[in-house]
Amino acid sequence: MPTDIFSFKQFDIDQTGCAMRVGTDGVLLGAWAGEDAAGSIPQHCLDIGTGTGLIALMLAQRFPQARVQGIEIDPIAAECARANAAASPFSDRIVIASGDILDSSLESLIGNQRFDLIVSNPPFFKSSMHAPDRQRTMARHEETLPLEKLICRASELLSPQGRLALITPRDRLKDLRLYAATYRLVSSRLTEVRTLPHKEPKRLLSEWRPADTAIDRSPFTDTLIIHPATGYYSPEYVRLTEPFYTTSFRILAVG
């Protein structure tokens, strides 16, 4: 039976009662989002659908000057995230709000703040695949946070130089580009995630920025392979996640 406490190097995640537990998707997004070759460091971050608070805590660890806000529609998960943030070394820089990011009343919590970095690991299952309990359905099914509405809302909350970072199924890229163009965002980074070299990519890490035009410039897409061989991890995966995981990795260079 899985433990309710997942320990990282600088913080713990208590998952008691939470529908969605710590997983590879969240860890990848928290480690990947906001990397910028130009050296731009976000000062104000927003985690939409923060769940246990995992990604919010990862951002607080990576960006010591940043203030991080998490928003979670499930009140049980929001309380869990608050407790995890309060127990962390970053408690003075993290605020967790309970509510629906699509609800205009949340302006009272966000105020006029615009964010340099918005992240989300959104639900992506379709309504025909409902989980038996409501809490898990909210966490896993897109009807609670449709991708287009998420991108629309994020575009309203981004600062002029802000970035929106997402992890989604790879097959949603066409939809992502359509919705981003509608709300005048362009892609700046795309990373396909493969578990093994011979497997098709199942996940996509994508980053989007406000644009003067709604034309997607289709940036170079790179690939992250988690396991170059069974039982081993790639150097790139280790580089991303080593600051967080407490375990040692068996590394095998790709190529």
Curated annotation (Swiss-Prot):
A biological-process GO annotation: tRNA processing
Catalysed reactions listed for this entry: adenosine(37) in tRNA1(Val) + S-adenosyl-L-methionine = N(6)-methyladenosine(37) in tRNA1(Val) + S-adenosyl-L-homocysteine + H(+)
Pfam families in the record: MTS
GO molecular function: nucleic acid binding; tRNA (adenine-N6)-methyltransferase activity
InterPro entries xref list: DNA_methylase_N6_adenine_CS, SAM-dependent_MTases_sf, Small_mtfrase_dom, tRNA_Adenine-N(6)_MTase, tRNA_adenine-N6_MeTrfase
Disulfide bonds listed in the record: none
Homology family: Belongs to the methyltransferase superfamily. tRNA (adenine-N(6)-)-methyltransferase family.
Protein's recorded name: tRNA1(Val) (adenine(37)-N6)-methyltransferase
Species of the source: Porphyromonas gingivalis (strain ATCC BAA-308 / W83)
